[in-house]
């Protein structure tokens, strides 16, 4: 069993059950999935950009990403419907917990000028989204082999019903959220 998964079952679940007064252990919020998305607008000019981005995603997530395609043509962006414009990965179970551990302990502290994650990035239903500007914060990416700095969106989906429950869950995992009072 993964370290964070064990922490969740033994420590976080009883603490959240007591804090929010859940009668059943199954009512306690838990992580459902983590989605990584990389939008690649520059792929319009060079098709190799998608391949390089997919290689980065494989190294970061440990599984093959799905290529996302443009749904409709957009003349302003010079995009046609059906063209590849990004890639995404959905992590669940063990890979999700492994990724979360690396994100919290290694990647987030390596972000330049980092002062904590915004507590305003919850969506109203306990899910949290954050953007990373550089993929090089992950140790799996070798800086000298990077062709371009690419960012990505990371969405952490939970079973929490409110932002307060989601915030408590992520704080219990050690997520570096800023205090809301500031």
Curated annotation (Swiss-Prot):
Keyword rRNA-binding carried by entry: yes
GO terms for biological process, alphabetical: translation
Gene3D superfamilies: 3.30.1440.10
Highest taxon in the source lineage: Bacteria
Single Gene Ontology MF annotation: tRNA binding
One cellular-component annotation, GO: cytosolic large ribosomal subunit
Keyword DNA damage found: no
Keywords: Ribonucleoprotein, Ribosomal protein, RNA-binding, rRNA-binding, tRNA-binding
PROSITE patterns reported for this sequence: RIBOSOMAL_L5
Role according to the record: This is one of the proteins that bind and probably mediate the attachment of the 5S RNA into the large ribosomal subunit, where it forms part of the central protuberance. In the 70S ribosome it contacts protein S13 of the 30S subunit (bridge B1b), connecting the 2 subunits; this bridge is implicated in subunit movement. Contacts the P site tRNA; the 5S rRNA and some of its associated proteins might help stabilize positioning of ribosome-bound tRNAs.
Family statement: Belongs to the universal ribosomal protein uL5 family.
PANTHER family per the UniProt record, alphabetical: 60S RIBOSOMAL PROTEIN L11-RELATED (PTHR11994)
Quaternary data: Part of the 50S ribosomal subunit; part of the 5S rRNA/L5/L18/L25 subcomplex. Contacts the 5S rRNA and the P site tRNA. Forms a bridge to the 30S subunit in the 70S ribosome.
HAMAP family xref list: Ribosomal_uL5_B (MF_01333_B)
NCBIfam families in the record: PRK00010.1 (NF000585)
Protein's recorded name: Large ribosomal subunit protein uL5
